[in-house]
């Protein structure tokens, strides 16, 4: 496998082509952003930690029957992945009220929800990734109802698997967001699963072990990510 030119650079990752048209190299950066890029900073070794956490969690999910774009971890910052066409939606899964949902609905942060909540947002930086519903997504040509049904099914499997896994590590999976990619007629879990994309709270202390520490200037951001890596790597 030969790494080629950079195809795309996002907030947290760079994507490079390879000599195989069906694969890409994903490079994890230390850059940190919040509030749709309004707040910027760096977290030392974040890319290294998120690359490892994502690789381990994607391997776990593959074993549980969730198809992903992940092929293998190449080095401490890079992984080889299938070259998917990203559906321009984020699927957000919420088990406990927190963040924007708690604020939007006037709920106390930490309230256990009576059922898992599934939301979608339109991946569009210019619009600040607005929440939309299924009908919006289909009406403006982003996806189909059949594809959405499959995306929600993938999200539910990911939630069930990760909730159980993190529970065993003494962590509450509060909420998370995922991206889905199209590849040879299939839908695959793509992007990453890490403290950048999940809210993870210590079960016994309630301590936040995720990017909220950066968003809210709570300090000890690197230490929180290291703690998640340590527990995932048990």
From Swiss-Prot:
Keywords: ATP-binding, Ligase, Nucleotide-binding, Purine biosynthesis. The keyword Ribosomal protein does not apply. The lineage of its organism: Bacteria, Bacillati, Bacillota, Clostridia, Eubacteriales. This is Phosphoribosylaminoimidazole-succinocarboxamide synthase. It is an enzyme of class 6 (ligase). It comes from Clostridium botulinum (strain Okra / Type B1). One of its GO terms (biological process) is 'de novo' IMP biosynthetic process. Belongs to the SAICAR synthetase family. InterPro entries: SAICAR_synt/ADE2_N, SAICAR_synt_PurC, SAICAR_synth, SAICAR_synthetase, SAICAR_synthetase_CS. GO terms for molecular function: ATP binding; phosphoribosylaminoimidazolesuccinocarboxamide synthase activity. Its EC number is 6.3.2.6. It catalyses: 5-amino-1-(5-phospho-D-ribosyl)imidazole-4-carboxylate + L-aspartate + ATP = (2S)-2-[5-amino-1-(5-phospho-beta-D-ribosyl)imidazole-4-carboxamido]succinate + ADP + phosphate + 2 H(+). Pathway: Purine metabolism; IMP biosynthesis via de novo pathway; 5-amino-1-(5-phospho-D-ribosyl)imidazole-4-carboxamide from 5-amino-1-(5-phospho-D-ribosyl)imidazole-4-carboxylate: step 1/2. It comes from the Bacteria.
């Amino acid at each position: 496998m030969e790494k080629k030119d950079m195809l795309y650079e996002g907030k947290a990752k760079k994507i490079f082509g390879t000599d195989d048209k069906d694969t890409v190299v994903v490079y994890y950066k230390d850059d940190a952003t919040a509030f749709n890029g309004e707040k910027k900073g760096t977290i030392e070794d974040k890319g290294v930690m998120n690359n490892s956490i994502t690789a381990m969690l994607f391997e776990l999910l593959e074993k549980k029957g969730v198809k992903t774009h992940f092929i293998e971890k190449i080095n401490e910052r890079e992984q080889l992945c299938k070259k998917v066409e990203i559906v321009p939606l984020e699927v957000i899964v919420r088990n406990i009220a927190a963040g924007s949902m708690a604020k939007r609905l006037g709920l106390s942060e930490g309230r256990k929800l009576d059922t898992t909540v599934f939301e979608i947002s339109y991946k569009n930086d210019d619009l600040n990734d607005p929440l939309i519903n299924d009908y919006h997504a289909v009406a403006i040509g982003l996806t189909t109802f059949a594809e959405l049904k499959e995306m929600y099914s993938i999200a539910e499997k990911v939630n069930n698997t990760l909730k159980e896994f993190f529970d065993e590590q003494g962590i509450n999976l509060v909420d998370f967001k995922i991206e889905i990619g199209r590849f040879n007629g299939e839908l695959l879990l793509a992007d990453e699963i890490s403290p950048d994309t999940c809210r993870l709270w210590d079960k016994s202390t309630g301590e936040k072990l995720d990017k909220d520490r950066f968003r809210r200037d709570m300090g000890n951001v690197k230490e929180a990510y290291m703690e998640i890596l340590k527990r995932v790597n048990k």
